Amino acid sequence: MCIRDSPDTREIHDADLVCLAMGFVGPDATSLVKQLEIELDPRGNVARDNNWMTNVDGLFVAGDAGRGQSLIVWAIAEGRSCAAYVDSWLQGGSQLPSPVTPNLQQLR
């Protein structure tokens, strides 16, 4: 996916939450990543801390955007864990399951 500005097709939508599913191509460092000044790791993935948060306060990342190309099961597990940290960040605590950590590596 590549997002490009097109003056004739611009739309603005109010939203409480925006989720991007990036698939296998990784983050496009020329668009939203650049606009929000999101830091990337040495592999070109969105850098995140141990709580799934990027360098932008309140912006969390899970799945391929943070891990790099991987299996859907990793994206699902990371999404669940990330949701628990988002819940905790918003509510001050969470009872949601958190099956994996941001730096957990698959066995090879």
Language model segments and positions:
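Non-catalytic alpha-helical coupling and interface elements of nucleotide-dependent molecular machines
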Residues: L20-G23, P27, S81-Q91, Q95
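Solvent-exposed, non-transmembrane amphipathic alpha-helical segments
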Residues: Q35-E39, W52, C82, P99-Q106
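FAD-site-proximal beta/loop scaffold in flavoenzymes
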Residues: R4-Q69
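Short, surface-exposed, polar/charged, turn-prone segments marking secondary-structure boundaries
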Residues: N45-D49, D87-L90, T101-L104
